[in-house]
Structures are given as C-alpha cells and as structure tokens.
Amino acid sequence: MTASKSSSATASASDRPDRYDPIALEQRWQSQWQQDDLYATRSPEPGQNAFYALSMFPYPSGSLHMGHVRNYVITDVIARAQRMRGDSVLHPMGWDAFGLPAENAAIERQVDPGVWTDRNIEQMKAQLARLGLSIDWSREQATCHADYYRWTQWLFLELMDQGLAYQKDATVNWDPVDQTVLANEQVDSEGRSWRSGALVEQKNLRQWFLRITNYADALLDDLDLLKGWPERVRTMQANWIGRSIGAEIDFRVSDHDDAVITVFTTRADTLHGVSYVVLAPEHPLVATLTAEHQRESVAAFRDLVGELSADERTADDRPKRGVPIGATAVNPANGESIPIWIADYVLAGYGTGAVMGVPAHDERDFLFARTYELPVKRVIQAAGTSDHLSDGEAWTGPGILLNSGRFDGQSSEEARQEITAHGQELGWARPKRQYRLRDWLISRQRYWGCPIPVIHCDHCGAVPVPADQLPVTLPKDVDLQGKGGSPLASLQSWVNVKCPSCGRDARRETDTMDTFMCSSWYFLRFADPHNTERAFDADAVERWLPVQQYVGGIEHAILHLLYSRFFTKALRDRGLLNIREPFERLLTQGMVQGVTYRNPRTGRYVAPSEVSDENAPKDPVDGGELEVLFEKMSKSKYNGVDPAAVIDRYGADTARMFILFKAPPEKDLEWDDADVEGQFRFLQRLWRLIESVRSDDQDQLLGDPVDPPEGSGLSDKEGEIRRAVHTAIEAVSDDLKGDFQFNTAISELMKLSNTLSGALPEASRAVQAEAVSALIRLLAPFAPHLAEEFWFSLGGQDSVHKQPWPLHDPAALVRDTVDLVIQVKGKVRGTITVPADCSKETLEELALASDVAERWLEGKPPRRVIVVPGKLVNLVPS
C-alpha cells in the first residue's frame, strides 16, 4: 500500500487534533512508513544517481545516548534530502556486535553473550525507530551473526592467500584486566588500554598480523584523493603512517667481526656528529654485544623497561634513561670509535631498533648526552652564523656543514645526498623509506569475536579452513572466566580436529579476530546484504560505492577509517572490487556535552540533584564552590540526557531540530533544556501557521490543481511572500550541500515561517499553495513526522518524502523596489525606497531630492556624488 490521502494514518479535518501532540502523531506516521515500506532501497533507474549515506554502525550496548542521536539524525537529514532531490538512496544500519563489553557483561550476568547482544540489538532498534530515521532495515547486519562473520572469515582467507595475513612471535601490548592483546592504536598516550583503562604490559606471544605496511605508500598518497574529508583526519592518518625518506647507515661493531648495527636516519648530513649509538633494550644484538662487566646493569635496565608501554617510553615529557653495554662501534663517516648504549626511548619494533645519537643536532639526543656526559660535536651551523653552540640547546635545523671532512661547506640538503651516495659506494649506506605504521595485530585472546579460520598441523603448518566449511562458528558452553589465554582453548572438543590437508590430528586456532576486522568491510556487505554465494558482488558494490557521505566520530580517524581503506585496497588488488577508496565524503560530528559540577579540590563530580543553587553551586559535602563546565556526557559525571525522556516530553522532531540547530555538525554541542523548549515552540508555531490556512476550508490546498502564481498579477504582500519562499529554498538547498550547515538551514525556516505567519492567510490560493508546499518540503528532512502530517492535512498526494525537492525561481528573488542607503561624507544618514531598475542618474536625482539630502546638505549643492547602483549614494558636501 502506498501512503496517500486516504491512508489510515491521515487525520481528516474532523478528527485532526487542535493542538500539536507529537507523541501520537509520530507513532502514527512511523507505523504507516513501516507498513508502506517507504524507505526500502530501490536500484537506480537508468540515468538516476545512486547516493549511499552511512553512519558508523554502533556497538549494541542496549541504550541509545545523545551522541548516537546526533550521528544518526545528521545522516538521516542528508539521506532524506538526497532522496527528495531524485537520487536513489541507500541508507542502511547494522551492529558492530563482537567485542569485550558483551563478553564482560556476559561474565558478570552469567548469560550467553549472543543472547545478551541480541537483546540489546532489539532494544536499540526500538529506540532508533522512535527517531523517525529513513533506514532500510531489510539490509540490517550484525557482525556477531554467523551469516555475516562467515564472510569475515572468507575475506581473512583471501588476505592469507595474498600473503597479507601471517603469524609471528612478537612483543605485544597485554591488557591485564581484559586479558587480551591490544594493537598499538588501542593504547592511549598514558600507556593505558583504550577500553579497560588498565596500564598495558608487554608480553611475548605468537600472533596473527595483517601486512597493512604493504599499502603504506598507497594509504598515504591516496589521502590526496579524499577532498571531501576533514583536513584534520587526513593529517592524523598521514602522521600515523609517518613516511620518512632517508638512509640506512651501517655501524660496524668493534671486536665483533660480523656484527653490524644498522640505523635509519633522515639526517645523513649529521653523520660526522654521531657520538654514540643506541639499541632498543630488546634488540637481539644486546645479548651478544654486552660486556661481562655490564651484564648485571643491562639486565636490570631491561627488566625496568619491560614494565613500560611504548607510549610511556617515548613520551616527550619523560626523562630518557639508558645504560652503556660496554661495547663500541665505528662511525663509518670518520672512523671514530663511539660507545653503544641501550635506552628506553628506542623501540625494537620501530625502524631497525637502533638509532644514532647526534646531541648537537637533535633535542632528545642533546638531553640524553647532557644527562650521561656524552660528547657533543657540532657539524651543522645555520647559514650566516658563527660557529658557536649554546650550552643549553641543539641546532636541529638545516644549515652548512662543518667538521665533516670533504663535505664541509655543503648545504644540508646537498650533503644528505652526497654522504648517502658516498656510503653506498663503500657499502655502508643505502637510500631508504621508513614508516611509523606497523603491521596490524588482529589476534585477541577472548571468546566473543570472529574465530580465525585456521587449523594448526604439526606436519602442514597453518592450514586455511576450506571455504566450504565456513563459517567456523563459536562453540557454546565455554568457560569465559579462564585467565591468561583464549577461552576457546579450554574446549578440547572444539579445538581438536583433523588437518584439512593431510588428515592427521590438528588443532584449531583459538584466538579470535580484532573487532575492527568485522567493521573494516561492513559497508560493502550493505550493498549486497543477502548474497549467500559470496561476501558481495562486485557489480552491486560498484553500483553504490564509494559511500557518498559517511558520518561518525573523530575518534575513528586512525583505527576504523585507516583499516577500512586498507581492506578496500587489498580487496581491489585481489580483483574483488573496482573502487579505490571506500568513503568519498566524511563528516566527523562533534561531541554532545552536558553541564557538570566539579569540586576542583577533590576532583569529585556532583550530581545536579545535589546542587541547590545553580547560580552559585556549592559542594554539599564540604561547602566549597563548584566548577561549572560543559563536558562529554557520561554517567560518571552525572551529565547525561536520556533521549527517550526528551522524546517522551517533546517528540522526536523537536529532539532532531535541537540537535541540528544548536551547533554546526562538526562542532561540539552543549545541551540546553531551554533551547530544546525553544525548538518545541517553533514547531508549535508551524502547527498554528498550517492551521491558519486549513481554517479557511483549504484542506485540499495541496491536492487540487492550482496555477502557479505569476509575478505581474501579485500584490506587494504576495511578492514579499514569494521572495521569502524562494530565498529560503535557495538558502536551505545550499546549506544541505557541501559542509551541511543544518543550523543555518533551520534559521532560514524560522525566518520563512515568521514572514508567512502574518501574511499567508490573506494571500491568493496560488501563493498560499506554493508557499506552504515549499515550507513543508523544506521542513521534511529535519522534522519528518510533522512535515508528513502537514502534507496530508492539506490534501497532499503520496508521502511528502517522495516529493521533489523545491527549486528556487530566480525571477521571484527580483525586487521591484530596493532600499537605497544615503551617506553623507561616508556616514549613513538614512534610506529611501527607489525602483529597482533605476539608472545611476535617476538614483542621484532621487537622493538629492530626498529629505535626507535636504537635512544634511542644508540646501547647498554637493561637491561630489558617488553612486553604487542598488546599494547606496554617498554625498560629499562642498
């Protein structure tokens, strides 16, 4: 059934309520839209544009918060506007459903994590439905369901066959609370787990990795293609990839014929200033090169460093510590003997695990050398300066070489190339690119994740599970509380299998995948959600992708967004895709913040219910003054706002309007109950405006054919109405493109409603029909329920959300008269109304004949008259 004038959801003139009752109205239209399958995705017709609007799908916690609301409402407005513009729109939703929160909740509540997750999904779907989102729920996906993670496993095997998935022993970040491995990106700047907050430990385990580093150059270079992404996100990814162009330098170890320490440097021009070499404490050469008299201190230092995370070791504000190992190396540039140290700031997993120390030209090396009284040798001076080094600083910029033998007098840029080439001839240097990016560690030692489809055989090694045996499903009856390893390892009936290759006894892989594996391709599945033969069809993907508009938080700039780009490129190389990038445009919405009351002396947050005077808040415990701040909403800060409570009181349309109006989408939004009330009052005013038209027995205003208004036959008031209508159409249309200024679009709707409120009832039927039709259609993406109600109440045929987006008429914007500013000596002294098509000569005559000129010129002719047609006349007295 198609929604129409006779639809059961439509209130007739007799039974329509006389006041705005959003709850009943919204429930009625949500039910009707679901019955009509209004938002089902239709394949694009020939010549029709396909538009894919997508929000980053949520973890199903069971509770919708205001951050969710902002994300999904923003995407919904974009999807609705594009649908009205004639595009075929794909706007799906799913659930990022694996992960530690569900497993931890299951342990705490003694419930199966699958049951827990499915229950949460249903709760959140019901909450989302109340927002009136134009989502095609027939394409819904949940990453924890076997019909989805079957294809995650299949894609893993594709990557494995490409050589992009591999296993190796590695020192990894271990979360002692969640008992699992973390990728580098999941450890914060304080060395804590991104989820549990525990201090991360270092542990040596055999782990699965993906070779994302194979795509480092492509991931970096193709950032230039992403013109529709925020510059901040592109910069964050570029910095994370961290491409450095330089050289590898070999330092031969004294008295160890075969031992060579290789370092990477971008400053080969400083090579003659190297006064020591530093190894990572974990570097394999440390054990063989350490002198006997230094073994005890080296061992103690290594134990100390082992307790620190990588971020702690490299933090700029932390003193750098080290110990000498009792061995020396030879500087290949000048043959000088230099000591070998180990230090906490050098990481085994980054670069070669060794660095050269140039104290005179690196701030970190300078501080380290000063701490341990190591030599400081200057080999670069700034152009045009004397050879002088301040005691308290290093010169880190380029300059002219000195104390560098044959390279003295060369510029840094020239010397970098010359020294590298010289070393390459002699066999101790070679050009090199290095990256900060590390391969993606995907192993997790937890139950609630996608099983890795590999079987380990003593004879055959790591054997892929055959594709026809997928999915490898998660077993039931697993002890989730086991510590120190994967819970799956404890279930022998699941672990012990036959090798698919040789038939001998073998064991399943018991690690599960990082949840980002599942979210790195879900946008592809939405394009072909019911395919049982493959993860997706390339033609279906090409029809919809890249995603034209992706919406999500800035916190995913490196993790999810980088991994998704990697997946897309790897699958393209595999021949499974034809696209180069997954997301054409990206909008990173700001946080939703609520007011907090904090005791600055104790750090304690006080609930608003405990604050007796909001104007002078005091802590009820110690009576001290409280700080009043706006911070990200959270339970611990007592500043959360329940979306359900807002909808129960004001309706979803008001919640949507507030979220969109309060701040530009990329900025943080400060919650304000008064502004929510203000949006509710605005919608009530719109209700009264539409009622004022209907009260004149015009409930078929949008149903009966009406000739469009013609400019020549319009009254001045009707001309003003048309100008206001078409000004709003132009402005709102512009605001719903590019940077999406929803707040200014709603401001335009407010202006239009103010103009129409007094003038519309007296206008002709044609002007009324045009104005009301445009107003309702412009409102539809923002307040979809109320717009639908208005549309049908005035006799509109079919849903307003199927109507074409209004187009502005440039002719309607042309005014018959304009207000001309009169200036005297450059200062505004008044205005006059003149015909819009006046010549400069006529404007001058009218200005001189005006009361303004008579008053300020005192009857004297001006020395000069400056005319700016349509804007102003400036009179310069004689």
From Swiss-Prot:
Residues 1-23 are annotated as: Disordered. It is an enzyme of class 6 (ligase). The keyword Protein biosynthesis applies. It catalyses: tRNA(Leu) + L-leucine + ATP = L-leucyl-tRNA(Leu) + AMP + diphosphate. Keywords: Aminoacyl-tRNA synthetase, ATP-binding, Cytoplasm, Ligase, Nucleotide-binding, Protein biosynthesis. One of its GO terms (molecular function) is leucine-tRNA ligase activity. ATP binds at K635. Belongs to the class-I aminoacyl-tRNA synthetase family. This is Leucine--tRNA ligase.
